[in-house]
A protein has these predicted regions:
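Bacterial carbohydrate/catabolite-sensing allosteric modules
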Residues: 1-53, 63-293
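Short, structured active-site "lid" loops
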Residues: 56
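Conserved small/polar residues in nucleotide/adenosyl-binding loops
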Residues: 296-303
Length: 303
């Protein structure tokens, strides 16, 4: 069988999802894969190869219209429900938001913010974040600024507003970002505005894109999504659809795995930065009595 695949090539999600697809397909299924992109021309190319099924992550209306007219079994891995007659396997975005909120709350945060793309359809992440915060009687600020994949537009229209927004936020604060790309932008903006991360602004992204997380300064904490399982479940669902099972419109939500903690959020929140440093040290060395004693006897930098 010939399977068309169209995912963002340079993303942590795509890499893991592809490994999940391979894990399902390779043991005993004679599948041949054609890899393209999610543009209209890319999808037309995939369709020209007469695929038996398509695995894709797409929300563009024109591309979705073309796919709907193709009468080929399709599983969409995009968070937007843009292909109603296709199968869908995607992140449980509300659960991602809940996990991020719990991460900040566990570090003593009482102020929170959310940053996503302008017109971002991932409202589930914000909804889960808000609902979990509301259980502790907290709310959050929201900033929508710039497209996911257009750096030029972001720099021209949103870079300065983002920096001003961060400067105006009450601190310390936990900022949850819809993607790791946005978390990197927040880290850069904080650096440009002389805002300390994580003492003043603590940052958590989504996808655990290891390259982006490592390149940011400081390295980014991120919600590790179930993208490996998404790829596996998407391939399994497509297999069932291709064998005639009536599963069009099936919707499978995959929960996140955990928050991978790196330096961008690895601190306890406190209004006084010296206190925050002390709390973070004590949490890190909870079972190290020598470390606590050394902290207690160390002179204050204010002396």
């Amino acid at each position: 069988m010939r399977i068309g695949i169209a995912l963002y090539s340079f993303s942590g999600f795509a890499e893991s999802a592809l490994r999940g697809i391979a894990a399902y397909a390779r043991p005993n299924r004679p599948w041949t894969f054609d890899h393209g992109n999610q543009t209209l021309s890319g999808v037309n190319r995939l369709l020209s190869r007469n695929p038996d099924g398509i695995l894709i992550s797409v929300s563009d209306p024109e591309v979705c219209e073309r796919l709907q007219a193709a009468h080929v079994p399709i599983v969409n891995m995009h968070y937007a429900d843009a292909l109603p007659r296709a199968g869908r396997v995607s992140n449980d975005d509300a659960a991602i938001g809940v996990l991020a909120a719990k991460h900040f709350l566990s570090r003593g945060h009482k102020r929170f913010a959310y940053y996503a793309e302008t017109g971002e359809p991932i409202d589930g992440r914000l909804r889960g974040f808000r609902e979990e915060l509301a259980r502790s009687r907290h709310s959050c600020e929201v900033f929508h600024g710039g497209p996911y994949n257009d750096l030029a537009e972001y720099e021209a229209r949103y870079e300065q507003p983002l920096q001003r927004w961060l400067q105006g936020l009450p601190k310390p604060i936990g900022v949850f970002c819809a993607h790791d790309h946005f978390a990197w932008r927040v880290a850069e903006s904080c650096q440009g505005a002389d805002i300390s991360v994580p003492a003043e602004v603590s940052i958590v992204g989504v996808d655990n894109d290891t390259a982006i997380c490592a390149l940011a300064d400081p390295p980014l904490s991120s919600v590790q999504t179930g993208s490996l399982r998404i790829g596996y479940e998407a391939a399994k669902l497509l297999d069932q659809m291709m064998t005639g099972e009536p599963l069009s419109g099936a919707n499978i939500l995959v929960p996140p795995v955990r928050v991978i903690t790196r330096r961008s959020s690895d601190a306890m929140a406190a209004a006084d930065t010296l206190v925050a440093t002390a709390l973070t040290h004590m949490r890190t060395h909870l079972h190290d009595t020598k470390g606590i004693c050394l902290l207690y006897t160390s002179p204050s930098p204010r002396d």
